[in-house]
């Protein structure tokens, strides 16, 4: 049984909901707290976490009268205690404290801790059967098979919190899984949508960071420019909705108004539209199975004027093709894909490789991993973290030769 509820079969939520926000001071956390701030009568904050932003975490914990606050950096425990002195708010520091925050009793958890560090806290929330709004890609890209199984076993409810998968989640409610023929994930095309391949190869960091529609962090903006981010979303959709690679299509939609579509057997296509504002999918998750009053601007289609669509160019954006290759390879290949991309993006930011070499490093790492016969199923979070670590080391080893070829 899927942990993602494809039909709204739950009764409407009643009473005050206890919520936990993992990654409260990041961009997703900020949007979540903005929505909580607007409806204080509906929610009580149980726990908040942050990576290292003690001041921001303490401010939020006091504002929302949280019962527990945790900072991932263990060395900052003294700072957090000082910031919360006299408030009565419990606090902790280190990985264990973040996991404790996730394990504390609450009805709803926003899992927005970035990177592989978010996997164990998300699992702690899943294991107690919580409703989890999932914004951490690594849970699915690096560990999707066992993560979704754990969620199903614990009868946890997984709500997709990013815009594309939340759009699919909403559209899928229009039919049964057996009636689905395909899902369509939209992509803006990024800043290089109309660029020639030779120009993309030589693109600078400043150019890669000029996203036409979304305001995001550095890593995800670079991933959008390479379309690696869309590749990661294809992998996430595979695990969230139990889809084969052939059932997942990517369409370039420069306006970023339609975020996802679902085609059913009668050839009806159901789409979800909204302004490019992360508060929209988060509000859907926060209110589910009800709807709450949103904070994003209303959509005015007359001002947009037109919605256009293009096929993605796999030759100019090979990162997207590689995601499908990794899915078809199976098991831990998607973990390797993600790890190699993280190493490649970091190298690009440091000007060690050209933009075009990002996908080449990912491809070489994937191929080397598969040739070595290292594909194996992942049975635990530690397995996923181990593969992630080894794949990063492999990508780092291959980096000099990729850089040399481009010079």
From Swiss-Prot:
Give UniProt keywords alphabetically: Isoprene biosynthesis, Manganese, Metal-binding, NADP, Oxidoreductase
> Which GO MF terms are attached to this record?
1-deoxy-D-xylulose-5-phosphate reductoisomerase activity; manganese ion binding; NADPH binding
Gene Ontology biological-process annotations: isopentenyl diphosphate biosynthetic process, methylerythritol 4-phosphate pathway involved in terpenoid biosynthetic process
Q: Which residues bind Mn(2+)?
A: 162, 164, 233
Q: What does this protein do?
A: Catalyzes the NADPH-dependent rearrangement and reduction of 1-deoxy-D-xylulose-5-phosphate (DXP) to 2-C-methyl-D-erythritol 4-phosphate (MEP).
Which Pfam families does this entry report, sorted A to Z? Answer: DXP_redisom_C, DXP_reductoisom, DXPR_C
Pathway participation: Isoprenoid biosynthesis; isopentenyl diphosphate biosynthesis via DXP pathway; isopentenyl diphosphate from 1-deoxy-D-xylulose 5-phosphate: step 1/6
- The entry's 1-deoxy-D-xylulose 5-phosphate-binding residues are 137, 163-164, 188, 211, 224, 229-230, 233
The residues the entry assigns to the signal sequence are: none
Q: Which SUPFAM superfamilies match?
A: 1-deoxy-D-xylulose-5-phosphate reductoisomerase, C-terminal domain, Glyceraldehyde-3-phosphate dehydrogenase-like, C-terminal domain, NAD(P)-binding Rossmann-fold domains
Q: Which family does the similarity line name?
A: Belongs to the DXR family.
Sorted alphabetically, which PANTHER family does this protein's record hold?
A: 1-DEOXY-D-XYLULOSE 5-PHOSPHATE REDUCTOISOMERASE, 1-DEOXY-D-XYLULOSE 5-PHOSPHATE REDUCTOISOMERASE, CHLOROPLASTIC
So what does this thing catalyse? Answer: 2-C-methyl-D-erythritol 4-phosphate + NADP(+) = 1-deoxy-D-xylulose 5-phosphate + NADPH + H(+)
Q: Which cofactor does it need?
A: Mg(2+); Mn(2+)
Q: Which residues bind NADPH?
A: 25-28, 53, 136, 138, 217
- This protein's species is Rhodopseudomonas palustris (strain BisA53)
Q: What is the name of the protein in this document?
A: 1-deoxy-D-xylulose 5-phosphate reductoisomerase
């Amino acid at each position: 049984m899927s942990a993602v509820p494809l039909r709204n079969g739950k009764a409407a939520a009643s009473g005050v909901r206890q919520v936990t926000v993992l990654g409260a001071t990041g961009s997703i956390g900020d949007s979540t707290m903005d929505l909580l701030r607007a409806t204080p009568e509906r929610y009580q904050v149980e726990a908040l976490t942050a990576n290292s932003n003690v001041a921001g975490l303490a401010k939020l914990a006091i504002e929302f009268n949280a019962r527990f606050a945790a900072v991932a950096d263990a060395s900052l425990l003294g700072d957090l205690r000082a910031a919360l002195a006299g408030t009565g708010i419990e606090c902790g520091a280190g990985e264990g404290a973040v996991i404790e925050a996730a394990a504390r009793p609450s009805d709803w958890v926003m899992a927005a801790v970035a990177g592989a560090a978010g996997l164990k806290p998300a699992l702690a929330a899943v294991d107690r059967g919580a409703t989890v709004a999932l914004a951490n890609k690594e849970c699915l890209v690096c560990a999707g098979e066992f993560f979704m199984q754990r969620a199903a076993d614990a009868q946890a409810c997984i709500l997709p919190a990013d815009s594309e998968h939340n759009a699919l989640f909403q559209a899928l409610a229009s039919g049964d899984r057996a009636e689905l023929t395909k899902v369509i994930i939209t992509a803006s095309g990024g800043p290089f949508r109309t660029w020639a391949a030779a120009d993309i190869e030589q693109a600078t960091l400043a150019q890669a960071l000029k996203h036409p529609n979304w305001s995001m962090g550095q890593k995800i903006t670079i991933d959008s420019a390479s379309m690696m981010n869309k590749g990661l979303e294809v992998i996430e959709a595979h695990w969230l909705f139990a889809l084969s690679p052939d059932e997942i299509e990517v369409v370039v939609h420069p306006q970023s108004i339609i975020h996802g579509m679902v085609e059913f057997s009668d050839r009806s296509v159901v789409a979800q539209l909204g302004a490019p504002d992360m508060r929209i999918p988060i509000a859907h998750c926060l209110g589910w199975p009800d709807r709450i009053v949103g904070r994003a601007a209303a959509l005015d289609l007359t001002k947009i004027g037109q919605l256009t669509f293009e096929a993605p160019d796999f030759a100019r954006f090979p990162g997207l093709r590689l995601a499908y290759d990794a899915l078809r390879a199976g098991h831990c290949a998607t973990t390797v894909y993600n790890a190699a991309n993280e190493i490649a993006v970091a190298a690009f930011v440091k000007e060690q490789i050209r933009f075009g070499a990002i996908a080449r490093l990912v491809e070489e790492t994937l191929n080397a991993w598969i040739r070595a016969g290292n594909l194996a199923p992942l049975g635990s979070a530690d397995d996923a973290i181990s593969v992630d670590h080894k794949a990063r080391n492999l990508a780092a080893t291959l980096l000099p030769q990729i850089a040399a070829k481009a010079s």
